[in-house]
Amino acid sequence: MKPILTPRLQCIADMIENRETVADIGTDHAYLPIFLISENKCKKCIAADVATGPLSRAEKYIEKHLGKTDRIETVLSDGLKNINENCDVITVAGMGGETIAQFLEANPLPVGQTVILQPMSKAEELRKFLYNNNFFIEDEVAVSEDRRIYSVIRAVKSEQKQPTEAVEIYISAPLLAKKDSDAVKYKEKVLQAVKKKLNGLEKAENKDEESIAEQRKICERLEKEI
């Protein structure tokens, strides 16, 4: 029996196919690892959390849904610190973008490593980190949950920085190109945030004309893509 995932977790699961090992950081109840194993999307999962309470809950849910299994290993870990096994995919969901970036910064990943990240806030800070640390965002999907709109980012560590436009701090190229209803909602949300920032810059006593011009350009690009 597999758990029913939230839209955010389902979006992550949809990005995973035919993998050997997936590590889920901040796993809580281990819903995602249980689902991935139930659907045979990977051969093994590591369910990691920083606290013993969530890990204990995870172990109970794993046995409830899958019985005794060696396909999910629970690990007490602060971020990626104690993830010693090579993993095809690392997932981190339900945390702020800055926190996710700190996890990745504290434990540099090898070239070719895939990460799937779902920031609850400060997504622009996470994208900025990814671009500055040689990650290529190969896909980004907008997803609605509880009347809010989020994004899920799949990125791969590459050997060098990839060229990006200024707008891609706020929304990556893959999501910018999408036209589904959630993508449009996400673009509208980002556009309102950029307009608010632009308004503040324009009202400042000491105007930064370069930043104003950049934000105007970003607004124009977003309006064109909605």
Language-model regions, residue ranges each:
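S-adenosyl-L-methionine
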Residues: 1-19, 34, 56-85
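Conserved S-adenosyl-L-methionine
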Residues: 25-26, 38-44
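Glycine-rich SAM-binding Motif I of class I
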Residues: 30
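Active-site capping/gating segments
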Residues: 46, 50-53, 122-128, 132-165
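Conserved beta-strand signature within the Rossmann-like core of class I S-adenosyl-L-methionine
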Residues: 111-123
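An accessory alpha-helical subdomain
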Residues: 163-226
